[in-house]
Amino acid sequence: YYGENGYKEICKRPDIDLVYIATDWAHHFPVAKEAMTNGKHAAIEVPSAMNMHEIWELINLSEKTRLHCIMLENCCYDFFELNSLHMAQEGLFGDVIYAQGAYRHELSPFWKHYWKNGPNDKLGWRLRYNKEFRGDVYATHGLGPIAQVLNIHRGDRMRTLIAMDTRSFNGKKQAEKYSGEPCDTFRNGDQTTTLIRTEQGKVMEIIHNVMTPQPYNRMYQLTGTKGFANKYPVEGYAVSAKDMKEAGVTPSNDDLSGHDYLKEADMKALVERYTSPIVKKYGDEAKEVGGHGGMDFIMDSRLVYCLQNGLPLDMDVYDLAEWCCLAELGSISMDNGFMPVEVPDFTRGHWNEVKGYKHAYAAPEDEAKALAEAKAFTAQLKAKGAKYWAAADKKATKKKGKK
């Protein structure tokens, strides 16, 4: 399969259950729509939808077909995020009232590597998208992990957002560098900040900056009534000795107040106490296999695990909608004097029915059965593939002999 429309033939195949979509942003939606229309689950790279029309189309199609539509947000599966989520779920931080996330990653060394649509396309698809669209166009790496901590559409929901940006300084220069022409309009500001207030009176702050020099940073900061977590630039936790003891962890001294980060020994003890079950199951293998430090492996493993065991996926189509909507809604806010914008309830009134975000797990006996069936199926596929390649090699050898 090849070419811009090859995916349509793939989606028609009866032997495929899920279509894994890792294209440029413009093709995420049409491929996902084609997949679900043809009875396939859709797993879509980030961001899965770029505007409200695409978001509602995916929701409607997923609900109509009863098929999974998941956004492949790998940053929800990094080790610090998984362990911190587990701590928050166990109440270590109290109520998390303010959470920050970001995508701060200067892309100037990479703009030239994004594919170009023909000889007249000098910018490449990603720089061109930033030139044409305002708002946080890549919010999900920062928003996804903190939305899980705040139980979004599982007891709380995003209610109102306000977005503000700088004007384009470096973005404009990058466009001029690659196009060789003056750039009068570059819509995306060098830095965009979005504030979101939830129904339960909590606040999320999301930052997007791919234009100015700075170390890679997804922020991931949780401010709770009893504790604090911070990933960038240095991983750390701040909790009191009293709360550590109540959690069953012996502090190095009784003077810990939460005013400073825990020392290495205390942090290690805390992480050992609250290591996520997912990290325990996949962590060692993830580090060995790699893929953004192992989080890609964990994400794909959880996706397959949930599908094999008939469980709800870790991220659903409503997560996709909430995490992607900042692009257009933020643009609306900024284009109208940085005014507050209401965030739709993508669940259509069901945001408070599930109490708390949770990962789903199968019973041990069911998990073992599903794993055995999967291994047997994989063995059959490998045998079939080996037979095919043996025949192909034999044919190639025979053809070579005739020459």
Q: Where are the regions a protein language model picked out?
A:
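C-terminal helical cap and adjacent loop that interface with cofactors, partners, or active-site loops
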Residues: A147, P215-T223, N230-P233, S240-K403
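Hydrophobic, small-residue-rich alpha-helical packing segments that form membrane-like cores
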Residues: M36, M50-E54, Y77
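Active-site beta-strand termini and strand-to-loop segments that position acidic
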Residues: T194-Q200, G224
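ADP-ribose/adenylate-binding Rossmann-like module
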Residues: G39-N51
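Predominantly a Rossmann-like dinucleotide-binding segment in NAD(P)-dependent oxidoreductases
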Residues: T65-H68, C75-F186
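N-terminal glycine-/serine-/threonine-rich beta1-alpha1-beta2 phosphate-ribose binding loop
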Residues: Y1-K40, W56, N60-H68, K375-K403
